[in-house]
């Protein structure tokens, strides 16, 4: 729907390789199926590329973007504005860790992609989201292959584990 658009990147952002993003979304299509209506949380939004991809692929998806960097939020707003998605995009300048209890219980799918040098924050976030998320929630955790961590609790089932270059993706599902 939004193909061919170049996304702006905040300074220091690390975009996901196009090949990796396409492969990831093909895997997610197989997991979430034909459901158009999804509540998605792009927790460490950066440029907003993951949430925007969902807005493009799922015309009824609602995406909440959070990031604690003003430059990232400005970039997400710039990238989302020409898409004319209205209320389907909710952009919040906030630390994702402080919004878990408000956002995670309503999310069907959560993207976790903190800066690679902050991998421990990703691990803490995944642990805390596991408490707040509904059973069946899907979580995608992108990590640096050099600093890779598995979830250290039994709240998540690993559905997929794929590596593309430096990026390693875990696709998890909240267990009962």
Question: Model regions: which residues?
Answer:
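Class I S-adenosyl-L-methionine-dependent methyltransferase catalytic core
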Residues: 1-176
């Amino acid at each position: 729907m939004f193909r061919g658009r170049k996304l702006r990147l905040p300074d220091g952002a690390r975009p996901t390789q196009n090949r990796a993003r396409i492969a990831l979304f093909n895997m997610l299509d197989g997991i979430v199926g034909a459901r158009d209506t999804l509540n998605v949380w792009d927790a460490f939004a950066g440029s907003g590329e993951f949430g925007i991809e969902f807005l493009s692929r799922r015309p009824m998806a609602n995406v909440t973007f959070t990031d604690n960097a003003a430059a990232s939020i400005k970039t997400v707003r710039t990238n989302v504005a020409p898409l004319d998605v209205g209320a389907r995009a909710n952009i919040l300048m906030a630390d994702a860790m402080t919004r878990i209890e408000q956002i995670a219980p309503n999310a069907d799918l959560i993207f976790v992609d903190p800066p690679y040098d902050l991998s421990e924050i990703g691990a803490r976030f995944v642990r805390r989201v596991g408490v707040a998320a509904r059973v069946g929630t899907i979580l995608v955790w992108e990590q640096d292959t050099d600093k890779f961590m598995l979830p250290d609790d039994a709240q998540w089932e690993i559905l997929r584990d794929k590596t593309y270059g430096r990026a390693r993706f875990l696709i998890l599902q909240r267990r009962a």
